[in-house]
């Protein structure tokens, strides 16, 4: 499971080095191929390809006429691209997605159990301040058994 948060930097070529707290597990568990995408363009989602492939299989089994499926496919394909981690642990983020998510220089890489999110560090801080974990969130999770 990918968990935690680590700072990283996006270089001038648009590559981000995967922080060591995630890299070893990713290489061992999933290999070096990824699907890099976004749902809304506000952050980068980095899926190890085996995880993305599982998700695609689930989506493929759903009615393709469902509006949520259409929007999911439209957005993840618009922002998405296959990529390979190089020997130095770097992933190229497509220019379109770098610009949309404003991921330049200092970024925050967060584990989301099966995938990573890469955020502009300042935007993430604002998101955390604007939408703090509330009692409503706690109650909703309690209903899910957490």
Language model features with spans:
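Flexible "stalk/tail and boundary" regions
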Residues: 1-7, 12, 23-88, 96-146
């Amino acid at each position: 499971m990918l968990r935690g948060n680590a700072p990283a930097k996006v270089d001038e070529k648009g590559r981000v080095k995967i922080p060591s707290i995630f890299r070893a597990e990713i290489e061992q568990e999933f290999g070096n191929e990824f699907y890099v995408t976004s749902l809304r363009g506000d952050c980068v989602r980095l899926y190890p390809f085996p995880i993305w492939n599982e998700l695609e299989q689930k989506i493929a089994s759903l009615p393709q006429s469902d509006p949520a499926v259409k929007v999911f496919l439209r957005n993840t394909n618009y922002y998405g691209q296959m990529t390979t981690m190089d020997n130095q642990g770097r992933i190229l983020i497509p220019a379109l997605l770098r610009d949309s998510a404003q991921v330049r220089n200092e970024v925050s890489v967060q584990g989301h159990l099966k995938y990573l999110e890469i955020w502009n560090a300042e935007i993430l801080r604002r998101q955390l301040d604007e939408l703090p974990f509330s009692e409503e969130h706690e109650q909703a999770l309690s209903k899910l058994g957490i």
